[in-house]
Each structure stands twice: as C-alpha cells, then as structure tokens.
Amino acid sequence: MPAKDVIFGDCARLRLMEGVNTLTDAVKVTLGPKGRNVVLERSYGSPAVTKDGVTVAKDIELRDRLQNMGAQMVKEVAAKTSDNAGDGTTTATVLAQSIVREGMRYVASGVNPMDIKRGIDQAVSSAVMELKKISRPCTTGKEIAQVGSVSANNDRTVGEMIAEAMNKVGKEGVITVEDGKSLADELEVVEGMQFDRGYLSPYFINNPDRQVAVLDSPFVLLCEKKVASIRDLLPIMERVAKAGRPLLIVAEDVEGEALATLVVNNARGILKAAAVKAPGFGDRRKAMLQDIAILTGGHVVSEETGLSLEKVSLPELGQAKRAEVAKDTTTIIDGAGDAKAINARIKHIRLQIEEAASDYDKEKLQERVAKLAGGVAVIRVGAATEVEMKEKKARVEDALHATRAAVEEGIVPGGGVALIRARNAISNLRCDNPDQDAGIRIVLRAMEEPLRQIVANGGEEASVVASSVASGKSISYGYNAAMRVYGDLMDAGVVDPTKVTRSALQNAASVAGLMLTTDVAVCDSPKREEAAPTQPVHGGVG
C-alpha cells in the first residue's frame, strides 16, 4: 500500500481552496452572453473549443494532489447540475467557489463549521421556495425559443429550431442532435413510430423513386417467433387479401418459402405486403413488439399468449393509416390503438425509467415513450469546420436540455436576476445562533456572484450593476448583458429555467458545505524518483 500524506486543519482547507479557485477561474470566463471560449488540448486531432462549463471542468486535472481533490469536488457540482438540469454548470461552479471562499474566512476566525453548514442549508431551502414563487410556466413556442436562445449563447436560430421541433413531436417526443453534412442547420421530423429495421427483400419496394415500400391502411401482423413455413402464414394472407388491404409483417424473422410466397404475391398484385424483422433483442424485443401492438390496436402472436399464426383472425391484427418500409427503417404512422391503452403503456414505461439503474436503459426507455407519444425530431448541426461543429453541437445540446427543464418546472428572469430577487426576499432570515446566521450571510453573498461574473465578463463594473439590479422594484427588472441595457428581462426574452437555477444553488451548497466541514485531508504521497545508478569510478592506469 502506498504511503499517505495526512494534512490537518487550515493547511488542508487552504490547499483544497486553491484547487477550487484554479478550476472555477478557468470555468467562469464562459459565463453569460459575453463569456469567452476555452481551448482544450486533445491527444489526437484538433483542439476542442468550448463555452460549456462542465466540459471545461471535466478536462482539468491538477498536478498537486490536494489541490486536485478540491478541484474534483467542484467538478462534481458541475457534473451533478448537468445531470439534473442539463445546463447551469458554470453558475453552479461560481456559486460553489463563493460559498467555500466566504465560509473559509468564517471558519478561520473561529466560527463553528457545522453551524455554518446548518445556516447554509436553511438559507438555500428558503431561497428555493422563493425561486418557485417567482417562477412562471413555460408553455408558448416563443418562451421555449427564448430559453433555447439564451442557453445557446444568444443564438436565435437554435432556439427557434428547438421550439419548432418541440411543437412537432410534443413535449414528450425525442429530439436528437447529430452532425450535419452542410453549412446550414436542418430539422427533420419523423412522425409516428419508427424503428431501425428495414425490408427483408428489395422486391417489396413499390416506390422506386424513394426506394421504399409504402402501405396505405395496412393490417399489421406481429409475431414473436420466426416465420418460415407457408402453411402457418397462408390462412391470414387469404383473410387479408379478401379484405383488399395491404399486410405488414413484423416478426423475429421471415425466411424460406414464407418470404418467397410474400414476394411472389406482392409482385403479382394479389397481396400488397412487406416483411421486417422485429426491433431490439431479447426482452427489449418483446417489449417493443407489445408497444407496436398497443399503438396499432393488435395482439402479439406468441406462445406466452397462446395465440398461433394459423388461428389469427383479422380483429387480432393491428391497423395503421400508413406504413413506410425503407432499407434500414420502418415507420408506422397513425396507429389505430386505443388512446387510453397507449397512455397507460406510457405511464408504465415512465415508472420503469424511474427505477432504471443505467443511463443506457433510461435512454432506451425514453425512446420508447417518445415513439408511443409523438415522434422523433433530429436537429442536424451545420458548420464550416469540425472544430466549429463540435462547439456548436455542444451548445445546441445544452439549449435542448435547458428547454426541457423550462417546460418541466417553468422559467425565471435570467442573467442572475432570479437569485438576486430570491436573496432580497430572504435577507431578514435568522437561525438559532450567530454561527448559523453566518451561514445565511455566506449564501446571501454567493447569490450575487453569478450576476457579478456575467457583468465582469462583459467588461462592466460589477458592483454598480449589482446595486442597481438589487434596488429594482419589478421582479424581472435586471441587466441585459448582451445589449448592455437595464429593463424587464422577461419581456426581453432573457430567461432561465427554474430547474437549472434551483439545481445550481442546491448542488453548490451541498458540496461547499462538505468542504467547509472538512478538517483532515488524506492523499497519496508523491513518488520519489529513484536516483539513477552511477557508474563505478576506476582509477587511471599508472
């Protein structure tokens, strides 16, 4: 086991504080509309340029181990805020630095750190309640576009594109961000349920221009096992052909004479059909087949349900307004499923999301919700160079997270003003003893810091602006750093999601409180480099 260094008291706290300052000073230059970029070295390829606080924080590792421990604790603030709200990482880092810095002064002067932490917790709890009072719902496309624009560094195009995507796929729909192939940003919306499985034979194609098989008002046969024998498939094919409608088969696989018969019947015009493999694998395949069944109002043919292919009747098949089968994707549009059953299925999947342990499982479950609820929108980010594309893509992803947070918990005035208003509302808060009151004062001072940093990054005098904003009568009165004017920030479209501001304050206070109550730090001793062996010195020959 390697030797350890044990550092006590003020010496430990000061070294931790140095690490906090180093990381925060690198991150906080990105805050606000006038914030600067940070260039990050990469072991291969061109360097990354970013204005995203958590990306900068994650890239920083300090040589001094004790300082690095302090930096890693603040990095946790940024990462936790990013996970919870998707944005506000720089604000959280700035708040954490201020709480730690002010708190260290009180601890050094003999104030009880445990009481300071209790005071901090009380102040944060009261401030969060005030933020919720200030908050207002974010419902209109204009408000969603404003949130997206502010988060994307005042890029209106991004905000409007996200608002349009949300309008088309709904607030529950999935919106993904991908690299574009042109200079312009593009939005593509896939309506209905789409999964990544295509036709099993190109002979199903009936639209040569688009290279797809289009089925209007099809019946949908869902089967959990392989379909190889024509005897299994023939009865249902005859029933569908009599009904004069197309047939879409979604099964584990369709092969041999079953596939050949489908192709021949399709080519002769006897039965318009297409066959695709079921999406997913194992239990996920079963779940997705059930999703399609509920969406289309059909049943899954499986041994578990006791339903066999020979006995399937038309009422047990799913139905849809339209189906499009391409080489790699299948889209089912406007399924005939019962709305109550679909909503119940969505509710059931949401419960699974809450219980899911891994991010991968949560992502896949969220995709299933989106496919049932509305659709999928893809934003393709365009740029002239790869470096610019990476930076822009990160901004668009931040903006997307921010708009989701705004829809969830509402919006507050941006530019650090919401924290100033919450601060004014709790300025007379008192606790059980003077040491706890010191914790309240620390939080009150920290809540000014994001506004001060935004103003400082814009090249203005922070104290003058902070004083003017604090004395404003209206809740949404503040300083618009992008335009360098005072006014109503809500009207100007300078807004932040309530969830982002709340998460930033809570996470910053949580980690800062732990650092203030730390009295001993234990870390690995630096390895001493072994001296290089020296060659023996030989005397000269006389």
UniProtKB/Swiss-Prot annotation:
Domain of life per record: Bacteria
Gene Ontology molecular-function annotations: ATP binding; ATP-dependent protein folding chaperone; isomerase activity; unfolded protein binding
GO cellular component, one term: cytoplasm
Entry-linked SUPFAM superfamilies: GroEL apical domain-like (SSF52029), GroEL equatorial domain-like (SSF48592), GroEL-intermediate domain like (SSF54849)
Keywords: ATP-binding, Chaperone, Cytoplasm, Isomerase, Nucleotide-binding
Record EC number: 5.6.1.7
Name of the protein in its database record: Chaperonin GroEL
UniProt organism field: Tremblaya princeps
This protein's encoding gene: groEL
